Amino acid sequence: MWKRGRLRPQNAPERRIRQFAQLICQSEWLFSEMLVQPSVKGMRQLLCQPSLTVTEKQSMVTLPPAIGKQSMDILLINTLLPYRYAYAVAHQDHVGAQTALKLMQEIPAENNTIIRQWQMLGQQVRTAADTQALIQLYQHYCQNERCIHCEVGQQVFRLNHIDVDSNNK
């Protein structure tokens, strides 16, 4: 069951599934092309297929691309680049794995609640690689109240003159 609270119509799950199916149909070799694409710009172009729709007269009309740059980047950050990295590691392709990491560093940082909280603590966030690392720290340490086991949490304790070593048992 999909949650639709505060969901814009253009982001409805049915619409996104239709767009993804259309993308797959329009590009027979999409997966292969994504694996060898050397740039973020090239990966965005693969995702930037024009959208087709049916008018009242059942004629096909080409519309502007179905998703914007920010949505493409979110797809790259959360789906395609991690998959590309995992695929490279599974096939012992060290160059491919490094390329996936390099591409993650070329995408601008996400802007979300978790990242804004890190920035309020003074953490510099420049790239998608930074945001993914900070989200991982948040999910592993902050959400589980494991501050004392986290390097960042320990630094905050030291700044507030809380003895970390006596509490770390």
Identify the residue ranges that each predicted region occupies.
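Hydrophobic, aromatic-lined core segments that form the binding pocket/scaffold
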Residues: 1-132
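Acidic, carboxylate-rich catalytic segments that either coordinate divalent cations
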Residues: 120-169
